[in-house]
């Protein structure tokens, strides 16, 4: 019997002769490309509307070339200066040359504004000297100081040296109630100029208070929604969602009418006899008004995450605890409440993050005591036009949000977050 030899297996091919394995790989690649192509528009939108603006915000807080771009000669001399010795003749000569050029180009105001941000009161010094720059003759140090004695103050030159640096920590130092100096680095501002840290703490306090009130008011409502019959709970859910159908501005303005001294609440308390007509409570244009209005506006953001978690808790757990001898209160605390922690965490995180960034409500009802850091950011963006300081304040606020997000992930876990 002849030895039989096994012939090698031929690879399985498609109709066109291409190996089937290669065909499958090509089909899988095409399906992946189609899947990715569907995500590309969303990715581009997120990058353009979220990631890139945040990166630009962070960059704006540490980069400002307004002085160096308009005063190039002086910037070069300031780079070589140690910041401690008296300014030399070359520095004054560069100052005069740049003042002439900046006045001719009508850009002196931009450079002066940048120095004024570091050393208030120097803008007029720049503009007044720029008008006399053509008449200044050598020796420039003597003629410039003669034109305005403030140029002999070394602190003015130190401020210019700091502003001549495009990359600077000065705005973040200001946002933390400090200032950046040539010789000492970061130092605290004078007591009367320390406003931002207090605003940060006030923002945190109000946000935490609003979060606590929303939890205190929202937990029973969410419990009712989760335990009542479907028909009744749907009606209550409509009441919870009703504020979303009304403009935020309208809701905030309504609280002004309710809380003002001649408003509904004060009139009712006078009518009942709780307070005298000449001793009405001040409930608006202060921290109290801010807390009340923000609690009302943010309450649904606490109720919905709580409701979504409570709805998944089987009622049999409570019945089992009762059957084992637990009182209703003990069963609720020991069995039911621990299962709602993901909802408490999600609602608390959502309300707190929304509260620390709120602007329109504190602006309308807050007055002087109820202003938050967001109002100061808006001020620097719209009125003082110090965008770099606004970016630094926003960057610190963003860092605080990221810390909260990290803490939530460590304590509860992002995987357990339920928002609805």
Residue ranges and their predicted role:
Residues 1-37, 56, 60-197:
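Membrane-topology segments of multi-pass transport proteins
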Residues 21-28, 251-295, 365-368:
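Membrane-interfacial helix termini and adjacent extracytoplasmic/periplasmic loops
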Residues 22-23, 27-28, 56, 210-241, ...:
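Transmembrane-helix boundary motif in ABC transporter permease subunits
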Residues 27-28, 32, 233, 287-289, ...:
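Amphipathic cytosolic juxtamembrane alpha-helices at the membrane-cytosol interface
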Residues 41-44, 240, 296, 302-307, ...:
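Transmembrane alpha-helices
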Residues 70-73, 77, 363, 368-409:
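Interhelical loop and adjacent transmembrane-helix boundary motif
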Residues 284-322:
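Membrane-cytosol interface at the C-terminal ends of specific transmembrane alpha-helices
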Residues 307-318, 322, 391-420:
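C-terminal transmembrane helix and the adjacent membrane-cytosol boundary/short C-terminal tail
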């Amino acid at each position: 019997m002849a030895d039989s030899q096994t012939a090698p297996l031929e690879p399985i091919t498609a109709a066109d002769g291409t190996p089937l394995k290669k065909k499958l790989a090509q089909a899988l690649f095409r399906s992946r490309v189609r899947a990715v192509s569907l995500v590309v528009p969303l990715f581009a939108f997120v990058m353009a509307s979220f990631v890139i603006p945040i990166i630009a915000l962070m960059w704006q807080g540490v980069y400002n070339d307004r002085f160096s771009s308009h005063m190039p000669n002086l910037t070069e001399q300031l780079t070589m200066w140690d910041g401690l010795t008296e300014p030399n003749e070359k520095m004054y000569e560069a100052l005069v040359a740049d003042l002439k050029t900046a006045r001719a180009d009508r850009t002196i105001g931009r450079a002066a504004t940048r120095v004024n941000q570091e050393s208030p009161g120097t803008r007029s010094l720049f503009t007044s000297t720029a008008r006399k720059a053509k008449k200044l003759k050598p020796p420039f140090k003597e003629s410039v100081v003669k034109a305005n004695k403030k140029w002999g103050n070394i602190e003015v030159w130190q401020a210019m040296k700091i502003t001549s640096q495009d990359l600077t920590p000065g705005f973040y130092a200001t946002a933390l109630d400090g200032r950046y100096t040539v010789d000492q680095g970061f130092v605290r501002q004078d007591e009367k100029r320390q406003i931002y840290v207090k605003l940060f703490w006030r923002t945190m306090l109000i946000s935490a208070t609003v979060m606590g009130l929303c939890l205190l008011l929202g937990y029973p409502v969410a419990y009712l929604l989760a335990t009542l019959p479907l028909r009744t709970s749907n009606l209550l859910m409509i009441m919870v969602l009703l504020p979303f159908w009304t403009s935020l501005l309208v809701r905030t303005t309504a609280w002004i009418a309710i809380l003002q001294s001649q408003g509904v609440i004060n009139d009712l308390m006078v009518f009942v006899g709780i307070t005298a007509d000449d001793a009405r409570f001040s409930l608006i244009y202060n921290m109290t008004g801010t807390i009340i209005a923000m609690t009302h506006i943010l309450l649904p953001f606490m109720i919905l995450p709580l409701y979504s978690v409570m709805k998944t808790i089987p009622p049999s757990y409570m019945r089992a605890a009762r059957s084992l001898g637990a009182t209703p209160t003990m069963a609720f605390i020991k069995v039911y409440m621990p299962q709602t922690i993901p909802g408490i965490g999600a609602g608390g995180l959502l309300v707190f993050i929304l509260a620390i960034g709120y602007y329109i409500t504190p602006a309308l009802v807050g007055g002087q005591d109820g202003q938050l850091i967001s109002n100061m950011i808006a001020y620097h963006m719209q009125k003082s036009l110090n965008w770099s300081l606004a970016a630094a304040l926003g960057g610190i606020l963003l860092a605080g949000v990221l810390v909260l997000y990290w803490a939530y992930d460590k304590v509860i876990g992002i995987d357990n977050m339920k928002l609805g």
